[in-house]
Amino acid sequence: MQRLWVTGYRSYELNTFSDNDPKIAVVKYVLKRRFVDLIEEGQLDWIITGANLGVEQWAAEVGLELSQRYPIRTSIMVPYENFADRWNENNQSKFLNLKESVDFFASTSDRPYYNSVQLRNYQNFMIQHTDRAIMIYDLEHPGKPKYDYNLIQKYQETKEYPLDLIDFYELQDMAEEYQENRKNDMY
């Protein structure tokens, strides 16, 4: 069984504040391409991600879409109970829809947030229960994903754990490919 941890920037770190922002379509396009490649190579059974707004929720959406055509499953894990309680109503609704749609949902802590140890426990759970990771993260533009990136780097010192890092250069290249494909599909 091949289990993939998918994480990356939060939506605000990519300056995406609307569901119809074209950057979201590009990120989903990149993730879909990567997931399909892994599926077709027999390297993907589970997409396991968090519930943060941004790359993690988009990865879950892509996983659910692909599960209509491929034998893959999608899981969302959160670091503590009541994860989305402080979000606005629209974001809570998106979270609840995803939570109800995925194949598996759980929290790595049975309590609401009380301190950062829950976040570290979540990270450790994710890396120990997956076989590889995909991150949308650019080392030249640090953000929240740096904590996951640093953990993966440390883990790789003692374990085989492939990391596919998608940076802004690759996103730009894929944005051009995405636009070209859309243009060709229109005619």
UniProtKB/Swiss-Prot annotation:
Origin: domain of life: Bacteria
A Pfam entry, by short name: YpsA
InterPro entries per the UniProt record, alphabetical: YspA (IPR010697)
Residues of the signal peptide: none
Any coiled-coil regions, as ranges: none
Similarity-based family: Belongs to the UPF0398 family.
PANTHER family: UPF0398 PROTEIN SPR0331, UPF0398 PROTEIN YPSA
NCBIfam families: PRK13660.1 (NF010181)
Official protein name in the record: UPF0398 protein LBA1157
Originating organism: Lactobacillus acidophilus (strain ATCC 700396 / NCK56 / N2 / NCFM)
